[in-house]
Amino acid sequence: MSEQKTLSVQKRDNLGKGANRRLRSEEVVPGVFYDTKGNNVAVQMPAKPLQKLFEEVGRTTVFQLEIEEEGKKSTHPVLIWDALFHPYKKKFTHIDFFGVDLDREIKIRVPLEFVGTSRGVKLGGKLEVYREFIDVMSKPLTLPKKITLDLTELDINSTIMLKDVAMPEGVRPATNENFAILSVLTPKSE
């Protein structure tokens, strides 16, 4: 397994809308770290290292959050839990980090990646996607970044159900419900 990435942040004392606006004008992103015991710490970090880390780890890869407070540093394994972006500048406006216990399963939403063109679509069928994400249970270090589904063998009137999805080792669906992920539908007649 590759070494985990680290993001350095500082504890933030000035809270509120005005303080957060001042931070953002200085290319600093406000955020909150929620630890495994339910406590939270207001933090701030430079925007560029955060953007770079987010591009590398996304929302399903554990990394180390190094919090500096009054000259002392503490490190915590975390996931990015929620991220808010400016509507058109594609810049972070706020971010939440979720501390994880590496030995306990967590529930997280993982994106699905669809590859290949199905036989049914080549014959004129219509691909209807019902889910682009699925919720899974896994220990934090075995979370997949995405789950890939190969569509090449799907014929017209075929459906991929949750039970048909091959999960990576150590990963299971977060629900017992069996729902449709996608279907190749019969083409409509003119």
Curated annotation (Swiss-Prot):
Q: Which Gene3D superfamilies match?
A: Ribosomal protein L25, beta domain (2.170.120.20), Ribosomal Protein L25, Chain P (2.40.240.10)
Record's Gene Ontology CC terms?
cytosolic large ribosomal subunit
InterPro entries associated with the record: Rbsml_bL25/Gln-tRNA_synth_N, Ribosomal_bL25/Gln-tRNA_synth, Ribosomal_bL25_b-dom, Ribosomal_bL25_C, Ribosomal_bL25_long, Ribosomal_L25_dom, Ribosomal_uL5_bac-type
Q: Which GO terms describe its biological process?
A: translation
**One annotated GO molecular function:** structural constituent of ribosome
Q: Where is this region: Disordered?
A: 1-20
Q: Which UniProt keywords apply?
A: Ribonucleoprotein, Ribosomal protein, RNA-binding, rRNA-binding
State its role: This is one of the proteins that binds to the 5S RNA in the ribosome where it forms part of the central protuberance.
This protein's assembly is summarised as: Part of the 50S ribosomal subunit; part of the 5S rRNA/L5/L18/L25 subcomplex. Contacts the 5S rRNA. Binds to the 5S rRNA independently of L5 and L18.
* Official protein name in the record: Large ribosomal subunit protein bL25
The gene from which this protein is expressed is rplY
